[in-house]
Structure formats: C-alpha cells, structure tokens
C-alpha cells in the first residue's frame, strides 16, 4: 500500500538531524542588560537557553563559533530530548568538536563529523573512532567526578539514575558490545524502511526522489541540493560521500534507537532505524553560508552542492570551536592562562571551556520543569523543534523570563507535508505560542523557517490548548513517544528465536519512557533486534 502524500511518515519518530539551518542563539536572544544579574563566579552576564528537540547540537556549535562577535557571556544550554540516543549523539558530537587538534587535525575532524552525523554507513577509520570514543564515554557516565574532570562542559546531574544506566548501555552498544554486522544491519533496515514508506512506488523511487527534491525542497529554498547526492542518500543513507563509495560499509550505530514492542505478551526492546528518510541532513549546514560565493549560480544552476557547502561550513565552524581545545590544554599552565586572559590575541573567541555548560534534562520533563524554582522564569531563550511543538504549553512558557524570546522551528523542509498543511501547522504554532504567553516579535524579519515570539508580561498558566482546524495535521503527527507503536506490516520484522513473532501495540502506563530506559539498560543480549521499523502514526 502506497503511503499517501502528507502523512508525515518520512520524518520518522526519532530525529537525528534538524530540519532548519543552524542559528546563532545570541543573535536570537534579548540584548544584554548592563544592569542585569551577572554570574558572581565568572563576573560575566549569563545566557540561559532551553532547547527542546534540537537533537544534533548545531545551534550550540554555531553559537560557540560566533561568540567572538558578541560581548563576553557565560552560556548555560539546557537540552531536553525525547530519547537517550539523541543525548548520546550530543555528547559524541561535542567531544569530537572539542577534540584536541594535536590528536585529530581539522580536516579529519570535519570529515568524521559529517559521516557520524549524517551517514548511515561509515568508513572503517571513522567507525573505529566512534567505538573508541563510545568506550570512553561509557566509562565516564557512571563516574560523575571523573566525567566533570574530563568533560567540564557537560552536566548529567539532572538525569535520573535509570537514564544514566540506559545512556551507558547506548554507549556500550556503540563501542561494539554486540559483535557482528547483524547486531545492526543498517543497509537492510534502511531498504526495508524505504520499501514500506514508498509501497508500490518503490520501483520508481528515483522518480519519487527527483519529484520531492525539485517540486518541494527546491521550491522551498533548498535549490543547492543536487539531484545525485539527494538520490544517493535516499537509496543508501549516505549523504556525504567524501571517499569512494566502496569505502562506506560499516553501519553507523549512532543512528540506532530502541522501541518497546509486545512479543508473545511480553515487553521487549527492539532496535532499528526510525529516523528521517525523506528530507535528509542537508538543510542544517548545507543551504546557507556566510561566504556568498558558495551560493553562486551559473546558467541557473548552483556552482556548489549542498554536500560541498556543508563540508565548508562545518570545517569553518570547527576551526572556531578549536579555540576551546587550545584553552583546555593551557589550563595546566596558570601563568600562560593569566597572560592570555590579560591580553587576548586578535580573533580569539570570547569564551573558554569553562564559559559554557550543556545540561541534559530528564526525558519527558517539559510539563514539570516549572515546578522547580531553579527553572521557573529562568530562560532568556526557548527553542522548540518542529517535532516537539506539541510540548509548547503555558507550563513550559512559565520557564521563560519576562521579555524572553521563543524560537519555533517550522516544518518548511518536511517534504511529506503539502503547502496547505504547512500553513495550518504555522497557524497552530502561533495559537500554541499565544496560549503559552508569547506574542509575535515586533520587527522580526520574515521567515518561513522559524517563527519568533517574545514573552508577554501578563502571561499566566491556565490557558487552554488551541483548537485544531479540520484538515490540519496534528502536531503530534511529527513526534510521538517511542512506545506509541502499532503492528508492523507482515514480512517486515525479523523472527526471534525461530518462528514468526506477532507484533502488537504495547500499552504502557504514563511512565513508559522510564520503563524503556530500564529495558535498554539491561545487558545488550536481552535486546531484541527488529529487521525494520514497525508501522506507526509517526514513521514507517
């Protein structure tokens, strides 16, 4: 059966990359008030940002790379994701970006970043790096003191103990806890997912790919994405081919995620790929550039592809972020550090490793954050990804300080949504933002990618959710809990221990995300492997 256009199933139920260009969060936040509170320890103003569903850390890295353009501030990034695999990818990507330049050169870091971040298959050297780094992180997560010593920019103190256990299990799987390609047969999982998504259109998948690219992505502003690179990603999951195609054959385990399913009346954790197979990772770094020459056209065709622009942007971003690695290496020489602080060199970023912290919040805590005084009215900026807009509520709005800003990612580059559905989605975003106590920013530049709001002074809890217009896709379509799975189509699952399993929806209590963490924290051998994704309301 062919998936109808506009179902949203190509987006998937787990996000691995954003569907919007990276933002400098300082440019989106309210201006610094000289008389405002300052961090008494660092004697610098603080910027507290809450990010829901940012998944890949692109906004954080962009903000850090451009810190030298702004007055000195201390950043507190609070990230809230709906699965621990996204938290693990955050940690891996940041540890790669902050890697000591003497251990890994800039080109190697940028190429490794692109492959780990956006490719379903890796080259063996990149896979070896992932295993080594995952093994290190698996040993650091259970030891908070050692973690704080080696990764001072990271804080996991807000996570529950069972979430930390599950996070350790994720890293151990990445490190090769289960040997052999059958532990995560990415190529087969990708093809099975694609077959079910396209249905009877599978044999014409190249035509479908070209239609989605030219009639949707190109029309919506992503003209630099080339037909060949988009078609290659749709077919194989390899977005950035920096070497010969034969070099990419190791499954990228960082794209694996777990889901609770019912098997013979018991709950089991199935591992598979439930991410995006429609848009791709080209939008985040590949359709905009500070260097306008990269966007130049010749005879109406872009001179550079999205992959080339992405590689350039990521390389420049990591070049700026490398300053944090140099500052970290100088911590053992106080006199050198004092000298550099007294007379900073031109071009040196205005931040150091100690001037920002990434805090990870417990899963599914968006509705309860306002109950804690440390979060109530704290954040100057709230960022909400399009896949978690259903979490935007008056309770969440109470966490934003008066005069704070709200940035909502729109579904502009979600190819499964038609134009009228995009307009309905934008209307729902505005209604939810208003109900949460926000008003449209006055003087904000028009954008089809982000909706910008500011906190109303008279906002209060108790507003009701806005009504959904007929024919408008529900915000919940873009992202649902991993447990909200329904039976998989026949023939798309791998039998367990002989015989054909019968997949049924797993009805779980309200604390099911915690239950999932408990199951994933079991020894890796206890995890059931699904050959492909089960059919759900959010992804196929």
Curated annotation (Swiss-Prot):
<feature type="region of interest" description="Disordered">
    <location>
        <begin position="485"/>
        <end position="522"/>
    </location>
</feature>
<dbReference type="InterPro" id="IPR039304">
    <property type="entry name" value="DNAAF3"/>
</dbReference>
<comment type="similarity">
    <text>Belongs to the DNAAF3 family.</text>
</comment>
<dbReference type="GO" id="GO:0070286">
    <property type="term" value="P:axonemal dynein complex assembly"/>
</dbReference>
<comment type="function">
    <text>Required for the assembly of axonemal inner and outer dynein arms. Involved in preassembly of dyneins into complexes before their transport into cilia.</text>
</comment>
<protein>
    <recommendedName>
        <fullName>Dynein axonemal assembly factor 3</fullName>
    </recommendedName>
</protein>
<dbReference type="InterPro" id="IPR027974">
    <property type="entry name" value="DUF4470"/>
</dbReference>
<keyword id="KW-0963">Cytoplasm</keyword>
<feature type="region of interest" description="Disordered">
    <location>
        <begin position="328"/>
        <end position="355"/>
    </location>
</feature>
<dbReference type="Pfam" id="PF14740">
    <property type="entry name" value="DUF4471"/>
</dbReference>
<dbReference type="GO" id="GO:0044458">
    <property type="term" value="P:motile cilium assembly"/>
</dbReference>
<dbReference type="Pfam" id="PF14737">
    <property type="entry name" value="DUF4470"/>
</dbReference>
<dbReference type="InterPro" id="IPR028235">
    <property type="entry name" value="DNAAF3_C"/>
</dbReference>
<keyword id="KW-0970">Cilium biogenesis/degradation</keyword>
<dbReference type="GO" id="GO:0120293">
    <property type="term" value="C:dynein axonemal particle"/>
</dbReference>
């Amino acid at each position: 059966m062919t998936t109808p256009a506009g179902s949203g199933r190509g987006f998937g139920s787990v996000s691995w990359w954003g569907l919007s260009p990276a933002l400098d969060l300082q440019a989106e936040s309210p201006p610094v008030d000289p008389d405002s509170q300052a961090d008494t320890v660092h004697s610098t103003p603080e910027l507290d940002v809450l990010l829901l569903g940012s998944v890949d850390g692109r906004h954080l890295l962009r903000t850090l790379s451009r810190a030298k353009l702004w007055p000195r501030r201390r950043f507190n990034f609070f990230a809230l994701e709906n699965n621990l695999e996204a938290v693990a990818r955050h940690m891996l990507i940041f540890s790669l970006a902050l890697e000591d330049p003497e251990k890994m050169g800039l080109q190697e870091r940028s190429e490794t970043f692109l492959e780990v971040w956006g490719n379903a298959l890796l080259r063996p050297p990149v896979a070896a790096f992932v295993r080594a780094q995952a093994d290190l992180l698996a040993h650091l997560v259970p030891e908070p003191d050692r973690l704080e010593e080696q990764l001072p920019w990271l804080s996991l103190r807000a996570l529950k103990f069972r979430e930390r256990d599950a996070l350790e299990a994720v890293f151990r799987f990445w490190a090769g806890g289960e040997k052999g390609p059958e532990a995560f047969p990415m190529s087969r999982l990708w093809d099975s997912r694609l077959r079910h998504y396209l249905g009877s259109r599978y044999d014409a998948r190249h035509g479908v790919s070209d239609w989605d690219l030219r009639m949707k992505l190109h029309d919506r502003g992503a003209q630099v994405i080339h037909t060949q690179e988009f078609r290659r990603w749709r077919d194989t999951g390899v977005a950035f081919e920096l070497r010969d195609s034969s070099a990419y054959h190791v499954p990228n385990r960082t794209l694996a995620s777990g889901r609770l399913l019912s098997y013979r009346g018991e709950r089991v954790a199935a591992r598979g790929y439930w991410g995006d197979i429609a848009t791709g990772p080209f939008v985040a770094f590949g359709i905009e550039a500070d260097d306008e020459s990269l966007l130049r056209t010749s005879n109406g065709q872009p001179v550079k592809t999205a992959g080339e622009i992405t590689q350039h942007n990521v390389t420049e971003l990591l070049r700026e972020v490398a300053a944090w690695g140099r500052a970290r290496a100088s911590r053992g020489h106080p006199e050198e550090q004092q000298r550099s602080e007294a007379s900073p060199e031109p071009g040196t970023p205005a931040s150091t490793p100690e001037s920002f912290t990434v805090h990870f919040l417990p899963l599914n805590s968006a509705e309860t954050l306002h109950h804690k005084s440390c979060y109530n009215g704290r954040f100057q900026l709230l960022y909400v990804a399009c896949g978690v807009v259903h979490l935007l509520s008056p309770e969440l709005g109470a966490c934003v300080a008066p005069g704070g800003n709200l940035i909502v990612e729109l579904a502009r580059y979600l190819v499964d949504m038609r134009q009228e559905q995009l307009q309905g989605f934008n209307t729902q975003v505005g209604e939810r933002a208003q109900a949460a106590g926000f008003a449209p920013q006055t003087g904000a530049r028009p954008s089809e990618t982000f909706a910008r709001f500011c906190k109303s002074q008279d906002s209060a809890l108790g507003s009701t959710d806005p009504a959904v217009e007929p024919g408008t896709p529900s915000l919940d379509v873009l992202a649902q809990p991993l447990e909200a799975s329904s039976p998989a189509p026949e023939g798309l699952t791998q039998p367990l221990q002989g015989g054909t399993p019968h997949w049924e929806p797993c009805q779980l209590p309200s604390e099911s995300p915690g239950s999932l963490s408990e199951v994933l924290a079991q020894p890796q051998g206890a995890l059931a492997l699904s050959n492909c994704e089960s059919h759900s309301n959010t992804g196929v």
